Amino acid sequence: MQRPFLLAYLVLSLLFNSALGFPTALVPRGSSSSNITSSGPSSTPFSSATESFSTGTTVTPSSSKYPGSKTETSVSSTTETTIVPTTTTTSVITPSTTTITTTVCSTGTNSAGETTSGCSPKTITTTVPCSTSPSETASESTTTSPTTPVTTVVSTTVVTTEYASTSTKQGGEITTTFVTKNIPTTYLTTIAPTSSVTTVTNFTPTTITTTVCSTGTNSAGETTSGCSPKTVTTTVPCSTGTGEYTTEATAPVTTAVTTTVVTTESSTGTNSAGKTTTSYTTKSVPTTYVFDFGKGILDQSCGGVFSNNGSSQVQLRDVVLMNGTVVYDSNGAWDSSPLEEWLQRQKKVSIERIFENIGPSAVYPSILPGVVIASPSQTHPDYFYQWIRDSALTINSIVSHSADPAIETLLQYLNVSFHLQRTNNTLGAGIGYTNDTVALGDPKWNVDNTAFTEPWGRPQNDGPALRSIAILKIIDYIKQSGTDLGAKYPFQSTADIFDDIVRWDLRFIIDHWNSSGFDLWEEVNGMHFFTLLVQLSAVDRSLSYFNASERSSPFVEELRQTRRDISKFLVDPANGFINGKYNYIVETPMIADTLRSGLDISTLLAANTVHDAPSASHLPFDIDDPAVLNTLHHLMLHMRSIYPINDSSKNATGIALGRYPEDVYDGYGVGEGNPWVLATCAASTTLYQLIYRHISEQHDLVVPMNNDCSNAFWSELVFSNLTTLGNDEGYLILEFNTPAFNQTIQKIFQLADSFLVKLKATWEQTGN
């Protein structure tokens, strides 16, 4: 029997990923596309994987380390405004902020009448506007001759500490007094005369390293001195105004902005009496901030640099079509506000419905506390049961995305897990009766925590792994919240939870990862990508929970070996998950050449679940892996024509996805397959996680340049002419926070939103 895997309300929890709070300055979701032009960043070498066992399916460089030498590339569109070095004079209107750290000292008299002094650091933030004088304006016309220098004088006051006086106490000891002093300071920001002023787009940090020395006289009349190094790092972001107009390109230029930082330095020395003395001096540090306006995009290759050393253009797609269906149209009005409002409403409803399906429930009183039902439906179809997989994914979503995960519900779920592990079922005896873990592979249970004994697809080996992942997150939450577990349940500490529940599920993975089982759709018995990847993730996550004394234990060594074995098995072409015949991940290789194509949304679900945080990036098949992204492309391509709901005449935006192209399950029986909320949301989640990863980690976008490097996703869904740039096995690298990067991220955002727009429109049409 087939089943839909998760109730629709549970699936909607995946929508949480669409509201991750990306920086709007980096990703202007609602703005139209514009041209991107830049050139000439320096290249740096590849970085290796952080784990020796994790060999990927493709060679993907890390965010900032790439091989080869540089060439020039630009991103543009015939309908967009080119940002290039130009003869236009523009106004720099964004202020820059300079932070000065100084030391402030003051004096006071103690109870013995002695004068004492104390010092503390002080940080002064000064705004230095990179702007033209009020008389200048930015016009939409070009200049024919160099302009005069524009110098802006900014006056401010620096609070510093100065030497005041010395005095001699009764015992002959000399004390020094310091006073706080206000020093008027002038910063000059100069935009040098030039016939070509180019857009300032990057935050440019400047670091000044200097050595500061000072002298002082101790009570014996000796002169002491001390020196210390000091590093001053200042970031001055600038941007051009909005009324720009370009005519013709010229060579990139570099603009220097000169200013002076006035600060107070301190140093220490030891006098003849062995005492440590401190002296302060005021120091003016001339500083020049240099803005190089030529950075942007770099081409490099898998095996060698492009032979063409001239510049080339990569054009972003304005419209994406698949068999006549508009996936997204950048030229049309793309207003994300209605979608955002709908997502916020739906998130609230989704959380409410999820908790209604977890016992104790006022809506379904027969559900025991901690039991998660797959669906409230009890006839046509009857899914009023609990599945290990569904329960774990539900709890995982609650802990990961709910502001209030309801700790008592989590503890009740742990209690259910504890007892199900120790309950006999059709696969064998519970772990309370034997050390054999085979019974943990039973996927389906009654809502009263008794075994379901009717025929079913057994075993399903992903359940214990998914349960481990969810419970490890619960352990983290308990530790962070400081929750007292009390004596109500059979575990009184997080150590008990790990030893009495998680350890047994890990033992199951060690014993049975290389054994056949049914897939997550409960249809095919074999070895499956989804099962293996979540098993790998569970083992990998668990290793950080062992204390120092356990890390050399035989059990932990078994876990490490299992991690190596699963990783190697997944990426070995001989096992078929990566197959030269296909440009996507194969879910179940044993049927790929006979019953199915192997294309399956479960591969995206696996990547989304395993790579939900940057800490898992060392595991294979990350969300930026070309194999994962190309799988999404092929799912869209195949399912566009399968389902009538994707007919362009019914809805002009987006593609609804199903489980796999050959699916004939309609939610109750065998007939005609259909799209699923779970599958469509999974596609959005993959892309949102891709965006979030690059922004939060400040990673460059790395795009393979041809089919040998697997670029179907990029060439068919993002760029319009990627395959025409050359035949070498190359990469297109879009540096973080450049115009090329930001506008490409916007395209991916539109593609991700298109799936939810499709979902929203369909539900509104049907009244859901």
Swiss-Prot record:
Residues 29-83, 125-149 are annotated as: Disordered. Glycans are attached at residues 35, 309, 323, 415, 424, 435, 514, 547, 646, 651, 721, 742. The active site is at 519 (proton acceptor), 522 (proton donor). Residues 30-48, 71-83, 131-149 have a biased composition (Low complexity). Its EC number is 3.2.1.3. Pfam families: Glyco_hydro_15. It catalyses: Hydrolysis of terminal (1->4)-linked alpha-D-glucose residues successively from non-reducing ends of the chains with release of beta-D-glucose. Substrate binds at residue 456. Residues 693-768 are annotated as: Y subunit. One of its GO terms (molecular function) is glucan 1,4-alpha-glucosidase activity. GO terms for biological process: polysaccharide catabolic process. PANTHER family: GLUCOAMYLASE, INTRACELLULAR SPORULATION-SPECIFIC (PTHR31616:SF9), TREHALASE (PTHR31616). Belongs to the glycosyl hydrolase 15 family. This is Glucoamylase S2. It comes from Saccharomyces cerevisiae (Baker's yeast). The lineage of its organism: Eukaryota, Fungi, Dikarya, Ascomycota, Saccharomycotina. The gene is STA2.
